[in-house]
């Protein structure tokens, strides 16, 4: 999967189970370490960092419904670890009278590296990020 993502062609997607965007990245690193390829950890991290742009976390909330709870961007390496920057998050605000989780989506004051690339592809983002 990571080999395919690193070929230079845009548009890969995959899923895995984890507890957070950071854990998802750690799990990818661990899966590569479990492979028979004998690569040093820093090479594996570099490989993962180049392959992944965005991590979208979906959680099952207290009412049993699934919701996107975090969108984070891979922003490079920091202290020999893959660094993530959260772009959006869902913040729970309690339960409605019907027992549904209430909350709001928070947009952080961070313009992702992918912003210009998405704009060139015709995705209108000004309503979210401003100009």
Spans of model-derived segments:
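NTP-binding/hydrolysis catalytic cores, primarily Walker-type P-loop NTPases
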Residues: 64-131
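Conserved P-loop NTPase nucleotide-binding/switch module
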Residues: 1-79
């Amino acid at each position: 999967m990571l080999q395919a993502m690193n070929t230079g062609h845009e548009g890969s997607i995959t899923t895995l189970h984890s507890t957070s965007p950071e854990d998802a990245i750690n799990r990818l690193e661990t899966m590569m370490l479990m492979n028979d390829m004998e690569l040093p950890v820093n090479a594996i991290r570099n490989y993962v960092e180049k392959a992944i742009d965005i991590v979208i976390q979906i959680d099952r909330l207290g009412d049993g419904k699934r919701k996107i709870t975090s969108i984070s961007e891979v922003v490079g390496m920091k202290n020999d670890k893959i660094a993530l920057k959260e772009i959006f998050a869902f913040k729970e605000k309690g339960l409605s009278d019907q027992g549904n989780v209430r909350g709001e989506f928070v947009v952080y004051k961070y313009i992702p590296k992918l912003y210009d690339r998405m704009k060139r592809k015709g995705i209108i983002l000004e309503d979210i990020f401003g100009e």
